[in-house]
Amino acid sequence: MKIVEVKHPLVKHKLGLMREHDISTKRFRELASEVGSLLTYEATADLETEKVTIEGWNGPVEVEQIKGKKITVVPILRAGLGMMEGVLEHVPSARISVVGIYRNEETLEPVPYFQKLVSNIDERMALVVDPMLATGGSMIATIDLLKNAGCTSIKVLVLVAAPEGIAALEKAHPDVELYTASVDKGLNEHGYIIPGLGDAGDKIFGTK
């Protein structure tokens, strides 16, 4: 599995600000979107382009445009919505597919409860966004859904990843690509990433 930890100074700076314990909901939300935007820039660096001729201000001019697979952005409810706006800054015409996953408190297994995928997802590259890759359960379940629907090109964008989640994702789906702002130390006894960001969903939605 291709794993890219984006080490750009802007990414590291913004992520550092997000780790502040008393950060406001407004600021956390803004930074989640901004880092999501920067991760998208990295994840789309290998998109193919083709030369086309358009009518410029002074006559015909040859330019490059993206060709090939179209894109669908796939936020995992609910926290993934916090990164979606930043992703769409770079791919504003992308279609949006939404997946909802919850964890069964008895079995601790991820359970899909909602999905609304674009009809031609088999023709699109999916950018799956979620702030945290902890155990990897929700992400694996989401990718299972996408593959069952015919999607074959999948990239994962997360703000912070734990080594445990990376290992689980690589075992389940070695063909996907992972882009993250940080690979953190690991999980604590409660399944939270350390040092992590805390509960990203609560911070984005102001329910902390």
Curated annotation (Swiss-Prot):
UniProt cross-references to CDD domains, sorted A to Z: PRTases_typeI
InterPro entries listed in its UniProt record: PRibTrfase_dom, PRTase-like, Upp_B, UPRTase/APRTase, Ura_phspho_trans
Pathway this chain belongs to: Pyrimidine metabolism; UMP biosynthesis via salvage pathway; UMP from uracil: step 1/1
Binding site for uracil: I193, G198, D199, A200
EC number: 2.4.2.9
Keyword vocabulary terms for this entry: Allosteric enzyme, Glycosyltransferase, GTP-binding, Magnesium, Nucleotide-binding, Transferase
One GO process term, biological-process aspect: uracil salvage
Cofactor(s) listed: Mg(2+)
Pfam families for this protein: UPRTase
Catalytic activity: UMP + diphosphate = 5-phospho-alpha-D-ribose 1-diphosphate + uracil
Cofactor annotation remark: Binds 1 Mg(2+) ion per subunit. The magnesium is bound as Mg-PRPP.
Major enzyme class: transferase
Activity regulation annotation text: Allosterically activated by GTP.
GO molecular function ontology, one term from the record: GTP binding
Residues that bind 5-phospho-alpha-D-ribose 1-diphosphate: R78, R103, D130, P131, M132, L133, A134, T135, G136, G137, S138, D199
Stored HAMAP family: Upp_B
UniProt record similarity statement: Belongs to the UPRTase family.
Function: Catalyzes the conversion of uracil and 5-phospho-alpha-D-ribose 1-diphosphate (PRPP) to UMP and diphosphate.
NCBIfam families on file: PRK00129.1, upp
Protein name listed in UniProt: Uracil phosphoribosyltransferase
Organism: Klebsiella pneumoniae subsp. pneumoniae (strain ATCC 700721 / MGH 78578)
Lineage: Bacteria, Pseudomonadati, Pseudomonadota, Gammaproteobacteria, Enterobacterales
Gene this chain is encoded by: upp
